[in-house]
Amino acid sequence: MSSQKCASHLEIARLESLNFKISQLIYFVLIITTLFFTFFALKVIQKKCIFQLSTKILLYQNLFSANIHQIFLGITIVERLNIAFFKLNDKCIPLRPETNCQLYLEMFIAGLSGMVYGQTGLLFERACATFIKKYEKRKSLATGIITSIIVLLLSGSTARIIIWDDPLSEYQLACTSWPSKSRDRSTMFFSICTFISLFNLVISLLIRRHNEKLEYSTPFVVGPRFRKREVIDSTSTICFLTFFQFIFMFIYSFGVFLLGTIREIIGYEQYYFWVVWVYTIPFIAASFPILLIYRIRYSNTNRIMIIKQFTSTKQTQEDHIKQMKNVWN
């Protein structure tokens, strides 16, 4: 017990602040939201999904990563709120040795990076579906499994790469905090994540545009046109998800950079007052299953409306061709 290190008065002041408690409660609501909507997202992907098998595998991986991040964050939040509400009057609030937090941090960052790398994996899969001829079930399955394994390996090793030469000799209030001697690298990591998110957004737009251009090169036969529309719809969904991820990652990366730049000017209290609100990763994780459900249902509803239009309207052959062309635009 003699080697135990206690929280400083600044850390205690941060824990007892109303701003901190509100932010943690909001994060906790986002965590519950993620878990709740993930259950429905899995059902929607399985039963009402236009995605190919490889896309489904990678969507499962993205949902898994989002929930890993939220679960480990949730454990930390419960511990923090327990201290904030019930233990602030204790003589010593013990800090955790960074060596004891290594595995916890690696899992936490694996979930975070898995969401970012997973989007890149989805775009790689969409590129395969676009450019590989005869992208049948076997190729789709192999692409999905191999890509998801690569994403999981990369995300699982990210934290270890960042802290590889850190002696882990300090103490932290929570295991989700970066080791003190690796914080510069962690800032660089989030900047890279923002760049990757921007890259994903640009590539998704290019793939979507390419598919739309090639749509009319497909013979006007229901089967091939329907499959091409599936590729366009699924790519549009990935583009939609990537856009929101980029917005949230940019807010976090730029916010942390800006606050870090002016930290000495605004002081410790103001820095931590604002930094909890620019941590947007829980919003990324919570929005993913919600937006995914929305896009899948939107696509299915749109298709049903098109089919009803075709079956309820009497047309000449020329009118039918014109309407079909408008639908595929």
Swiss-Prot record:
Q: Would you indicate the residue range of the signal peptide?
A: none
Which top-rank group of organisms is this from? Eukaryota
**TM region(s), chain numbering:** 25-45, 57-77, 104-124, 144-164, 187-207, 238-258, 273-293
Record's keyword annotation contains Transmembrane: yes
**Principal subcellular localization:** membrane
For this UniProt record, the keywords arranged alphabetically read as follows:
Membrane, Transmembrane, Transmembrane helix
- Report the InterPro entries cross-referenced here: 7TM_GPCR_serpentine_rcpt_Sra, Nematode_rcpt-like_serp_alpha
Q: Specify whether Kinase is a keyword of the entry.
A: no
Which Gene Ontology terms cover its molecular function? G protein-coupled receptor activity; olfactory receptor activity
* A single GO cellular-component term on record: membrane
The entry's localization annotation reads: Membrane
The membrane topology noted for this protein in its Swiss-Prot or TrEMBL record is:
Multi-pass membrane protein
| A GO biological process held by the record | detection of chemical stimulus involved in sensory perception
PANTHER family according to UniProt: SERPENTINE RECEPTOR CLASS ALPHA-1-RELATED (PTHR31357:SF5), SERPENTINE RECEPTOR CLASS ALPHA-10 (PTHR31357)
The text of the family note is: Belongs to the nematode receptor-like protein sra family.
Q: This protein is called what?
A: Serpentine receptor class alpha-3
The organism is Caenorhabditis elegans
Q: Which gene encodes it?
A: sra-3
